[in-house]
């Protein structure tokens, strides 16, 4: 589970998220509103929004389009979540059943972490996570 999580506000624009994902090499971003988790935005969601409307547009037009869209329009909501005591097996099953790449870990109403496909694969392979990412 990753505990250093980059979150984004539900009112933020897709252009900002694209920048954060590119610079931070992040593929999943929990979306918050008023301190509460309300959704998850994945790199796949961002690509889907971009490709559906902008297949033949130039970079400037594409950026203008992404800037005009709020995250709430393309995020997955409500998010599928797990608790901090959930097993890796449960996390893997939920990700497979719902065809999602991450699970926010919520303790009460507080976002405590994020379990990704990579975390599950590392567990299966017996690879210890990078301490810098925890």
Regions found by a protein language model. Name each.
Residues 1-4, 42-80, 92-96, 116-134:
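Tandem CBS (Bateman) regulatory domains
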Residues 8-25, 31-33, 81-99, 106, ...:
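The conserved cystathionine-beta-synthase
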Residues 27, 32, 40-44, 106, ...:
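Short hydrophobic beta-strand motif reused across regulatory alpha/beta modules
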Residues 36-37, 48:
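Short active-site-proximal "capping" loops at secondary-structure junctions
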Residues 37-40, 88, 111-114:
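Glycine-rich acetyl-CoA-binding "A-motif" of GNAT/NAT acetyltransferases
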Residues 39, 101-102:
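Glycine-centered small-residue hotspots that permit tight backbone geometry or close packing
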